[in-house]
Amino acid sequence: MIRQRTLKNTIRATGVGLHTGEKVYVMLRPAPVDTGVVFRRMDLEPPVEIKASPDNVGDTRLSTTLVNGEVRVSTVEHLLSAIAGLGIDNLYVEVSAAEVPIMDGSAGPFVFLIQSAGIVEQEAPKKFIRIKRAVEVREDDKWARFEPFDGFKVGFSIDFQHPIFSNGVQTAELDFSTTSFVKEVSRARTFGFMRDIEMLRERQLALGGSLDNAIVLDDFRILNEDGLRYEDEFVKHKILDAIGDLYLLGHSLVGAFTGFKSGHALNNRLIRTLIAQEDAWECITFEDENESAPISYAQPVTAF
């Protein structure tokens, strides 16, 4: 049987909020079976809980933001990507502000935190969402699609007219039965253009953004002295984002996702469209010892 997973211990970290530029504390706590991923705003009295789910997604302009009434937690996608990549089902995420700290702009620090806390299996079968037929959403020339696949596969294409992209388009496809999320995806950082960052700062946004937590480009080159962590780091970060956005479904996917110039808004529209079409998916478990589960989920990933 493939079992649900949570953390072995509670662990805490400190970082900077991408948009406020202020110090943010985050604490990851184990949670009981069937809890899912629940964010808690501990700076409020009483603390307010927001479950990671498609219906609780509010603003998707610059990051994925979860809302409960007037209360919000933004920039959740990198942490959710790490949680998904390590197969964690149940977790409390306590934060001291309205955003998750940006850390180094990737999911790597969150992977390290989760692995440091330890991962334990729980006495309940892990639930999966299996894609039964293709579902697609489009907006202008952008699109995102789910298709049936025996495992978990993510493909993505980005298109930027910039000198560092030889033909504008960068594409990657990763089958997680043969690819390690931790090694190949988790360290890919968010990226932005200097001109956009300056415009955001005028609107009191991206105040915590720096070369320490993003790849920054001017009109000609990458400004980070250390260069890239992966040759295709830009598109791999979009895959990282997508994995986090898709985990708002609440369960790991058995299926394939493909995105072309998709972002948080379109990713969220796709998962809402999927949920609404009940013949397009099913919730499954792998409880029979003789049943062959998709190889991507056979063992927890516990090391870099």
Curated annotation (Swiss-Prot):
Biological role stated in the UniProt entry: Catalyzes the hydrolysis of UDP-3-O-myristoyl-N-acetylglucosamine to form UDP-3-O-myristoylglucosamine and acetate, the committed step in lipid A biosynthesis.
A Gene Ontology biological process term: lipid A biosynthetic process
Organism: Thioalkalivibrio sulfidiphilus (strain HL-EbGR7)
Pathway(s): Glycolipid biosynthesis; lipid IV(A) biosynthesis; lipid IV(A) from (3R)-3-hydroxytetradecanoyl-[acyl-carrier-protein] and UDP-N-acetyl-alpha-D-glucosamine: step 2/6
Cofactor(s) recorded in Swiss-Prot or TrEMBL: Zn(2+)
Catalytic activity: a UDP-3-O-[(3R)-3-hydroxyacyl]-N-acetyl-alpha-D-glucosamine + H2O = a UDP-3-O-[(3R)-3-hydroxyacyl]-alpha-D-glucosamine + acetate
EC number(s) per entry: 3.5.1.108
Key word Lipid biosynthesis present: yes
Keyword Lipid metabolism: yes
Gene Ontology CC: membrane
Residues that hold Zn(2+) according to the record: H78, H237, D241
Keywords tagged on the record: Hydrolase, Lipid A biosynthesis, Lipid biosynthesis, Lipid metabolism, Metal-binding, Zinc
NCBIfam families xref list: lpxC
Family: Belongs to the LpxC family.
Location of the active site: H264 (proton donor)
Single Gene Ontology MF annotation: metal ion binding
Protein name: UDP-3-O-acyl-N-acetylglucosamine deacetylase
UniProt xrefs under Pfam families: LpxC
